[in-house]
Amino acid sequence: MPTRNIAIGGVQEEVYHPNALRAALAEFISTLIFVFAGSGSGIAFNKITDNGATTPSGLVAAALAHAFGLFVAVSVGANISGGHVNPAVTFGVLLGGNITLLRGILYWIAQLLGSVAACFLLSFATGGEPIPAFGLSAGVGSLNALVFEIVMTFGLVYTVYATAVDPKNGSLGTIAPIAIGFIVGANILAGGAFSGASMNPAVAFGPAVVSWTWTNHWVYWAGPLIGGGLAGIIYDFVFIDENAHEQLPTTDY
């Protein structure tokens, strides 16, 4: 099983080393960039429509903002931290044995803080406009949303593995960030009208903290972590040769 490759890592190397701190800072900045663009697009839509109902054009705009924002966020962080920008991606990569536990926890902290910082900056920059928190649409139950988040995040992390983690790929340059941005945009078009299509606990956490809205917040942790974990385990176990498996450098996924 892939979990055979999980390593805890040394505190000195994975927490206090300058390279680890640089990687954590890169995750903080990349997540801030992504959440600022994604949540900012939602605030802009509410401003333009005077908090009107979500429209098809609004959903498309949200999908594009998140796809473009994630493409940039992953690209600028890829050579430093791997550009995870998502605790679910970090969790999936951890279960596949491609990052140590301590480095994963460090990334999680950086990602969550980056999201919170982005939302506080948005609140200040917009003059106190409400920060839209993730929530379920009318008629959508928590279990329905949970399945949506599991499936969508599975697709996202599977894409990360196929384009960025799998050692058979070599260097794909900008193809991996583009593919990752595309799958997020496509999933928002599919699930945005139901669960909000978070696929990322950090993306849901920042708005929840700033708006102090926690209703069904567990869905946006459980779903992405289950989906991301399953994708990491399945891809690593089925498609990556065990004999060729090795811990990736900390500058990669």
Swiss-Prot record:
InterPro entries: Aquaporin-like (IPR023271), Aquaporin_transptr (IPR034294), MIP (IPR000425), MIP_CS (IPR022357)
Induction text: By NaCl and abscisic acid (ABA) treatments.
N-acetylmethionine PTM sites in chain numbering: 1
Main location: membrane
UniProt GO cellular component terms: chloroplast; columella; cytosol; endoplasmic reticulum; Golgi apparatus; plant-type vacuole; plasma membrane; vacuolar membrane
Biological processes per GO annotation: hydrogen peroxide transmembrane transport
Pfam families membership: MIP
Membrane-spanning ranges: 25-45, 58-78, 105-125, 145-165, 174-194, 220-240
Source taxonomy: Eukaryota, Viridiplantae, Streptophyta, Embryophyta, Tracheophyta
Vacuolar side: 46-57, 126-144, 195-219
This protein's domain notes: Aquaporins contain two tandem repeats each containing three membrane-spanning domains and a pore-forming loop with the signature motif Asn-Pro-Ala (NPA).
Function according to Swiss-Prot or TrEMBL: Water channel required to facilitate the transport of water across cell membrane. May be involved in the osmoregulation in plants under high osmotic stress such as under a high salt condition. Transports urea in yeast cells in a pH-independent manner. Transports H(2)O(2) in yeast cells.
Descriptive protein name: Aquaporin TIP1-2
Membrane topology, as annotated: Multi-pass membrane protein
Cytoplasmic side: 1-24, 79-104, 166-173, 241-253
Record's subcellular location: Vacuole membrane
Assembly and oligomerization: Interacts with cucumber mosaic virus (CMV) Protein 1a.
A Gene Ontology molecular function term of the record: mRNA binding
UniProt xrefs under PROSITE patterns: MIP (PS00221)
Domain of life: Eukaryota
Key word ATP-binding present: no
Motif NPA 1 per UniProt: ranges: 86-88
